């Protein structure tokens, strides 16, 4: 995998904090191609030969033998763990034991965490593989397959011979280069004593080994390729390369060969270490560090082919060598044996785990002897993690500790999500020290603390980032155990290749009982006594915090903070923009006077006017919360108003403003990921720059009467939002219902969008002069017509709308339609009588309205890493026909859905050729499908392009789960179908 010297494993340019300005020179070969290409048909993937050095018959014969042992690895790291993120990718491996079905590849392919995958042989047979070993430090690991599953290919294996790797040796790299089925790259070994390449911080790095260097120009996907000589012997393992040259780095196969022999003999693969990183430094540099001339002469005499010695680069605190070896010490011997190579150090340490050995080294010209106990490298390599409250944790690993010279201890956040999302930018690199003021030095202590925390509780957490251990951070987090119900321990099982899950707590402790709390508002100071009532309007504002656990309805934000307006303080109702409350599947917190917060509940979502109503318990708030007075007169262009709002810094600001225009418009759609947007709006625009810095506010008269809500409207991109006013008269009927403590359960609406036309445009398209005169006579502001801009795709139960794009609306139920507000009668009527102009002909239509009761998302299915739901209204608005009600809204970065090519914003129409019109029929089909079997899916893209793919289920890591919202209680109920 290309790492470009960066700290993030998925190829994104995300550098560690200490290396922001440092350009790295090395990369680790991508084990996936740079694009999400699928494997090409065999007719398009013939071997790519690089014959710059040789084209002998012997090479041709060797390559024919080698390719039968080389496999393409298609795999997934199904969970973030240690230095690795969850991802789907591809790489190369090769058979080293045909009888046992053993495949050698890179450690960064096998990964330290959960792995699933399969391999494809040269004849396109594919078999499942399981990981059986990954080295704690060096970049190699082994996968295993059942040889009985290979039916049409005679298995061959490559022999490992590290002794044949010599300078000048002509080699071939045979592998899955850049995602191709098979590429063969030529090169010549130029170095055999290179230090291990540095791939950056917070990612996997090899160390304490020599690397072999050659110029082969390998790219993504070639990780794990065998490097063979002319006789077909594997002399090295492809691992990485340079981003600025054609240089590649190969791992010597001496340690993989030893590990393979242990596996074949059924012996444990012992690994010893003293937590010291050594670097091979040339003799002149050793001399500058204090290596004496006499010692150099002796070393050159004993090792005439060597150019340097091993020097201590890093000694980890609290490790076996801490205080005994110091940085800059030059290693001379171990247990009486003189040392010149990393290989011999590995051999000695691996054979003496738990024993004390004598180390002799020079420090500033003095020879020093120390007895050091050899530690067990496997003991400081984590093999378990805990998943709770949406985040994952493991004990700090040797890999991470070495990057920043830390003791190998502590609780490491390997997936900072859910309740433990400390930063929007970084999800890796955090060490948690205390939770709820209790120390959590390791996983066991952390588990016991988390068991005692009730759901929905708020607790302080103390943490640091490994890149800056000087800085201590304290943050109050919200413990979410109702959306993120899983609290489990995962332990690696090298026999089965799986990670075994153990539930640590079936249900969280119930939330603590809430008690009423006091809060005090500070009124806005005004020198003008006529605005005394305006100063109290701060008591009508509340902060609204939203947590959305999933990507339902393609809403882009998991966490958001905005403000709302209390429209009924007696019953506890707040009006807020749907920019912050997009759907029912979220947690809401209402904060009063920046002092106390109480839980809120979404009780009403307006289908097109971009506002939501949330409810809180007013008995829990002992503060002077007030509802404003509401005007019953619509605003006009030119009206003078007073603005009170909250800016980007969440601070209240005020301004005198004037209504510059009132426009009929629709918010621009996002066709890549359709989501909720405001439509058929009659929006108020102002002549003030200050108001555009505020996402929430109110427009009032001098006496404090509220004339309009100032709201944020999410635009076509995540970064773009529009700020516009919504006239209070447009929501007055809903507000009056709330004041009667009645929540509207159902509105009706027209299933179409309308846009404004000038009189000239209307005249050109056939509007008669008599109608134009009627509009001119009744106009109070701009004279315009409304035309049908878009007609939404109907649901399966509904009939298509009789309206067509381009229809010019003259009247509805006999009333002229001068602006969007004239459609308001649709909320209570099952049908409306339209007078329209279509193709210059005047027509009368009966247009039915649609019921919005079931419009919002209330049923979600998680299947094979894909998130499925009924197409929400934002999807139907942009389509003319819905292929199916099984809509793929999102997918995980590591599940079967991603691995086998399911694309979000598409539809599943058939499963195993059985039609799946809706989620219920889909569940009925998939619940009968066994685990680890292939499923045929028929898909239709958002652009109505059909496709067929196959997908292999994996219920161990990706069980089928449904979430349904109870219409009465508003609670979401979870049910697991396949697990």
Swiss-Prot record:
Residues 21-34 have a biased composition (Low complexity). It is found in: Nucleus. This is Pro-apoptotic serine protease NMA111. Residues 65-260 are annotated as: Serine protease. Belongs to the peptidase S1C family. Residues 277-362, 871-943 form the PDZ domain. Its EC number is 3.4.21.-. GO terms for cellular component: nucleus. Pfam families: PDZ_1, Trypsin_2. PANTHER family: PRO-APOPTOTIC SERINE PROTEASE NMA111. Residues 1-20 have a biased composition (Basic and acidic residues). GO terms for molecular function: serine-type endopeptidase activity. It comes from Lodderomyces elongisporus (strain ATCC 11503 / CBS 2605 / JCM 1781 / NBRC 1676 / NRRL YB-4239). The active site is at residues 108, 139, 222.
């Amino acid at each position: 995998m290309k790492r470009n010297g960066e700290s993030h494993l998925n190829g994104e340019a995300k550098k560690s904090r200490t290396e922001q300005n440092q350009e790295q020179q090395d990369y680790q070969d991508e084990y996936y191609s740079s694009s999400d290409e699928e494997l090409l048909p065999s007719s398009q993937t013939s071997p790519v030969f690089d014959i710059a050095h040789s084209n002998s018959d012997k090479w041709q014969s060797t390559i024919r033998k080698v390719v039968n042992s080389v496999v393409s690895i298609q795999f997934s790291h199904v969970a973030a763990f240690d230095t690795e993120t969850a991802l789907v990718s591809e790489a190369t491996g090769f058979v080293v034991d045909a009888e046992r079905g053993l495949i050698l590849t890179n450690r960064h392919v096998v990964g330290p965490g959960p792995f699933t995958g399969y391999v494809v042989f040269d004849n396109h047979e594919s078999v499942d593989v399981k990981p059986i070993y990954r080295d704690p430090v060096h970049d190699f690991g082994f996968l295993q397959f059942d040889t009985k599953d290979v039916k049409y290919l005679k298995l061959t294996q490559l022999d490992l011979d590290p002794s044949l790797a010599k300078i000048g040796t002509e080699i071939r790299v045979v592998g899955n280069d850049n995602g191709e089925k098979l590429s063969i790259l030529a090169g010549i070994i130029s170095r055999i004593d290179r230090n291990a390449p540095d791939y950056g911080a917070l990612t996997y790095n090899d160390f304490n080994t020599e690397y072999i260097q050659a110029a082969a120009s390998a790219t993504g996907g070639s990780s794990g390729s065998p490097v063979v000589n002319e006789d077909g012997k594997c002399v090295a393992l492809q691992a990485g390369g340079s981003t600025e040259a054609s240089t590649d780095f190969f791992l010597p196969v001496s340690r993989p060969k030893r590990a393979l022999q242990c596996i074949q003999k059924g012996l444990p693969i012992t690994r010893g270490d003293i937590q010291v990183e050594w670097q091979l430094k040339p003799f002149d540099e050793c001399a500058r560090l204090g290596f004496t001339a006499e010692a150099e002469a002796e070393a050159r005499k004993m090792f005439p082919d060597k150019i340097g010695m091993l020097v201590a680069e890093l000694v980890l605190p609290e490790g076996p060598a801490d205080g005994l070896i110091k940085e800059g010490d030059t290693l001379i011997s171990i247990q009486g044996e003189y040392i010149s190579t990393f290989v011999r150090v590995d051999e000695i340490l691996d054979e003496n785990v738990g024993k004390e050995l004598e180390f002799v080294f020079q420090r500033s010209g003095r020879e020093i002897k120390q007895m050091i106990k050899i530690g067990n490298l496997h003991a400081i390599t984590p093999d378990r993690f805990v998943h709770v409250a949406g985040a994952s944790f493991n004990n700090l690993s040797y890999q991470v500790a070495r990057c920043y010279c830390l003791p190998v201890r502590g609780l490491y956040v390997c997936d900072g999500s859910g309740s433990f999302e400390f930063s929007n930018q970084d999800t890796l690199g955090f060490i948690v020290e205390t939770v709820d003021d209790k120390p959590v030095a390791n996983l066991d202590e952390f588990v016991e603390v988390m068991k005692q925390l009730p759901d929905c509780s708020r607790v302080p957490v103390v943490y640091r980032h490994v890149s800056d251990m000087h800085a201590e951070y304290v943050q109050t987090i919200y413990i979410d155990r109702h959306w993120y119900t899983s609290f489990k321990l995962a332990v690696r099982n090298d026999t089965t290749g799986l990670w075994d899950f153990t539930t640590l707590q079936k249900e969280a402790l119930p939330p603590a009982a809430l008690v009423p709390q006091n809060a005090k508002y500070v009124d806005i100071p005004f020198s003008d006594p006529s605005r005394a009532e305006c100063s109290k309007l701060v008591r009508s504002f509340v902060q609204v915090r939203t947590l959305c656990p999933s990507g339902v309805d393609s809403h882009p934000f998991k966490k958001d903070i905005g403000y709302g307006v209390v429209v009924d303080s007696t019953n506890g109702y707040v009006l807020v923009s749907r920019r912050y409350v997009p759907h029912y599947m979220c947690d809401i917190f209402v904060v009063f006077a920046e002092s106390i917060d109480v839980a809120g509940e979404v009780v009403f979502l307006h289908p097109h006017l971009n506002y939501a109503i949330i409810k809180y318990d007013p008995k829990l708030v002992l503060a002077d919360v007030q509802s404003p007075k509401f005007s019953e007169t619509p605003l006009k262009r030119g009206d003078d108003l007073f603005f009170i709002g909250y800016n980007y810094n969440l601070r209240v600001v005020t301004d005198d403003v004037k209504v510059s225009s009132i426009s009929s418009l629709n918010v621009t759609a996002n066709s890549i990921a359709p989501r909720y947007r405001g439509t058929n709006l009659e929006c108020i625009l102002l002549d003030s720059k200050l108001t555009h810095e505020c996402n929430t506010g109110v427009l009032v008269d001098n006496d404090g009467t509220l004339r309009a809500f100032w709201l944020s409207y999410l635009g076509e991109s995540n970064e773009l939002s529009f700020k516009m006013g919504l006239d209070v008269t447009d929501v007055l009927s809903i507000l009056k219902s709330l004041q009667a403590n009645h929540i509207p359960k159902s509105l009706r609406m027209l299933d179409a969008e309308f846009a404004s036309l000038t009189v000239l445009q209307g005249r050109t398209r056939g509007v008669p002069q008599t109608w134009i005169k009627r509009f001119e006579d009744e106009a109070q502001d701009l004279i315009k017509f409304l035309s049908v801009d878009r007609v939404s795709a109907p649901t399966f139960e509904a009939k298509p709308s009789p309206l067509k794009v381009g229809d010019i609306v003259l009247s509805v139920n006999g009333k002229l339609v001068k602006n969007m507000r004239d459609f308001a009668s649709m909320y209570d009527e099952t049908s409306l009588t339209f007078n329209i102009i279509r193709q210059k002909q005047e027509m009368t239509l009966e247009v039915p309205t649609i019921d919005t009761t079931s419009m919002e998302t209330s049923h979600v299915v998680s299947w094979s890493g894909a998130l499925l739901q009924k197409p929400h209204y934002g999807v139907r608005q942009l389509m003319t026909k819905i292929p199916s009600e099984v809509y793929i809204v999102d997918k995980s970065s590591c599940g079967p859905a991603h691995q086998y090519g399911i694309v979000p914003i598409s539809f599943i129409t058939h499963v195993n050729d059985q039609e799946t019109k809706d989620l219920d029929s889909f569940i009925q089909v998939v619940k009968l499908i066994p685990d680890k079997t292939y499923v045929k899916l028929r898909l239709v893209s958002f652009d109505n392009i059909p496709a067929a793919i196959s997908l292999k289920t994996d219920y161990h890591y990706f069980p089928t789960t449904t979430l349904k919202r109870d219409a009465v209680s508003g609670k979401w109920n979870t049910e697991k179908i396949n697990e």
